[in-house]
Amino acid sequence: MAILGLGTDIVEIARIEAVIARSGDRLARRVLSDHEWSIWEQHQQPVRFLAKRFAVKEAAAKALGTGIRNGLAFNQFEVYNDELGKPKLRLWGEAKLLAERMGVRAIHVTLADERHYACATVIVES
């Protein structure tokens, strides 16, 4: 196994909160997959949930070497938790095709949040 890419992102939670206050759920609709959306709608801390997903998806796009552009969209990345609560990532559409072309065999995700910030790191391996 070799590291093919590494991405990290930090999000100011108040910034996400301000966007939601200004434009309602538009950002959440753009960022979240259908499954994540269903969780977000019922989450006790929806702003924090969205900030963490945003950070993971930005970090993942950076790890793939492109960022969110060139056909990649936030909803092509889906964050979920395994049975122990560890964050994992599913890829769809162009993100999945790009990962396959790169030879990605494993994706590692870590995320953390504190009062003001959410931070994520994603490593893609062959």
Swiss-Prot record:
Cited Gene3D superfamilies: 4'-phosphopantetheinyl transferase domain
Keywords noted in UniProt: Cytoplasm, Fatty acid biosynthesis, Fatty acid metabolism, Lipid biosynthesis, Lipid metabolism, Magnesium, Metal-binding, Transferase
Binding residue positions for Mg(2+): 9, 58
The organism's place on the tree of life at top rank: Bacteria
Record carries keyword Transferase: yes
Main location: cytoplasm
GO molecular function, one term: holo-[acyl-carrier-protein] synthase activity
EC number: 2.7.8.7
Record's protein name: Holo-[acyl-carrier-protein] synthase
Gene that specifies this protein: acpS
